[in-house]
Design a protein with these regions (language model features):
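Helix N-cap/coil-helix junction residues
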Residues: 3, 156, 219, 272-273
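Flexible, small-/acidic-enriched active-site or ligand-binding loops
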Residues: 165, 229-275
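Aromatic-enriched alpha-helical interface/lid elements that frame and gate functional surfaces
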Residues: 125-200, 204
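A structural signal for well-ordered alpha-helical segments within the folded catalytic domains
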Residues: 65-72, 145-148, 175, 191, ...
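Active-site-adjacent "lid/gating" segments in soluble enzymes
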Residues: 2-137, 142
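Alpha-helical scaffold segments in soluble metabolic enzymes
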Residues: 70-77, 149-153, 180, 212, ...
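A glycine-rich dinucleotide-binding beta-alpha-beta segment and adjacent secondary-structure elements
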Residues: 199-251
Length: 276
């Protein structure tokens, strides 16, 4: 087709050209058809969920991560082009993007290599979800002071027990910790725990159901979600862009154009008569 990088570079030497593939430009997998779940499988994230069998993230995560990787790479290339006048060819693979994304936390216990390395538990094992009287909550109880505040609030002496006395001890005895904490909060309401723990800076949040997200007071305050009316689909809810520019905080409040939405407008600019 003549639209590869080398062909276009002859016409526009300083072009920034990005190509996205599943597995990269070389190797035994380059001709495979690729979907997000396949990248989750190859990159190891499906094995990182710590269940009896591998499971996928319940979202199409690496399609989106690769898009963000491309946007970041292009932005960097644009800065370099402004400084040097040179373009770039940016080959980006979903696999590399996935590995780069998950490595700092998913693979933190596999980073150091050697015979004498003591591997730590998976990071997210230390972040369980707890059941309260009415809802689920997430609490980060790594810091001694945070764990003590929870125990004091629930009138418990767990923080004085040797097996839970320090962060290392709590991580080491994680299963026992989860059971013990679940027991002392089982009769407490989630709103009460969040409100009181928040007063002392303890990291805590209610686990929203998918039907509750738009009712969360922080989401409402930030106007994180907007509602529009689509000419075909009807009324719909969607997130606003997560960034704000200094001089432009208003974002489009209409749907993406459907096929042919702007035909008349564009054709009229090309002096095509209405009758045609």
């Amino acid at each position: 087709l003549g639209i590869d990088y080398e062909s276009i570079k002859e016409t526009n030497p300083n072009i920034i050209y990005t190509s996205i593939s599943g597995y990269g430009q070389t190797g035994p997998y380059i001709n495979r058809r690729v979907y997000d779940p396949l990248i989750q499988a190859t990159a190891g994230s499906a094995s990182a969920q710590n269940n009896e069998k591998p499971e996928f993230f319940r979202t199409i995560v690496f399609d989106k991560v690769t898009g963000l990787t491309a946007a970041q790479s292009i932005s960097t290339a644009l800065v370099q082009k402004e400084r040097t006048g040179k373009g770039q060819y940016l080959p980006i693979s979903m696999l590399d993007s996935a590995l780069y994304y998950i490595w700092p936390d998913v693979m933190w216990s596999k980073t150091l290599l050697g015979e004498d390395i003591k591997y730590l538990p998976d990071l997210f094992d230390a972040f369980p979800i707890f059941k309260t009287k009415d809802k689920y909550i997430s609490m980060i109880l790594l810091a001694d002071a945070d764990f003590q505040k929870l125990c004091e609030l629930c009138k418990s002496d767990l923080h004085t027990k040797e097996e839970f006395a320090t962060t290392d001890k709590r991580v080491e005895n994680l299963d026992s910790l989860i059971s013990a904490v679940s027991e002392i909060i089982k009769d407490q309401e989630a709103e009460f725990l969040c409100r009181e723990l928040d007063k002392f800076g303890v990291p805590v949040a209610i686990v929203n159901s998918l039907d509750e997200i738009h009712e969360d007071p922080q989401v409402i305050e930030q106007k994180s979600l907007i509602e529009i009316t689509h000419p075909v689909a009807g009324k719909m809810r969607m997130p606003k862009p997560p960034f704000n520019f200094t001089d432009q905080n208003e974002f489009p409040k209409s749907h993406a154009p459907s096929l042919g939405d702007h035909n008349r407008e564009i054709l009229s600019e090309l002096d095509v008569e209405e009758a045609d």
